[in-house]
Design a protein with these regions (language model features):
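N-terminal beta1-alpha1-beta2 module of alpha/beta enzyme domains
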Residues: 1-72
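Flexible, glycine-rich active-site loops centered on histidine and acidic residues
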Residues: 2-18, 81-123
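Structural motif
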Residues: 43, 75, 105-107
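Catalytic metal-binding/acid-base residues of hydrolase active sites
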Residues: 46, 77, 109-111
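Amphipathic repeat-derived elements
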Residues: 64-65, 72-74, 98-103
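Active-site nucleophile and cofactor-binding loops and adjacent substrate-binding regions
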Residues: 74-82
Length: 123
């Protein structure tokens, strides 16, 4: 059996700054690795405090430098919001800097307001 942790980076109240929320996400990942968890997964959401994680690939790249063993995953990258060639280039880069620890999760997205604000039609 394997264990993972899902990092939403949720700002539960405005008493928390963005820096505190992101700092907590970083700390949770480091502690998860120390506790023997196999994977840390990072969300992608935009334009709200439900999740302050607009780029799970950036989070994986950052955490690759702060961890040694734990696998790092995207949960999920919202594919319609990306330009395909750039997305593939970034995935390749992140997999390289993480020494092959990237677990890539992709999805179609579901929050209509995120698509509207990016000027993308939701399928």
């Amino acid at each position: 059996m394997e264990f993972g942790v899902f990092i939403l980076a949720q700002q539960r109240g405005y008493h928390q700054t963005s820096q505190q929320v992101i700092g907590n996400s970083i700390e949770q990942t480091v502690v998860a690795e120390q506790a023997g968890f196999n994977t840390a997964w990072y969300a992608e959401h935009h334009f709200n405090n439900y999740s302050l994680s607009p780029s799970p690939l950036m989070m994986v790249a950052h955490m690759a430098a702060k961890t040694q063993r734990i696998r790092l995953g995207t949960a999920v990258c919202i594919l319609p919001l990306y330009q395909p060639a750039r997305f593939l280039a970034e995935v390749g880069f992140v997999d390289t800097v993480s020494n092959g620890r990237l677990d890539l999760g992709v999805g179609s997205g579901y929050q209509e307001f995120e698509f509207e604000r990016f000027g993308v039609k939701i399928a």
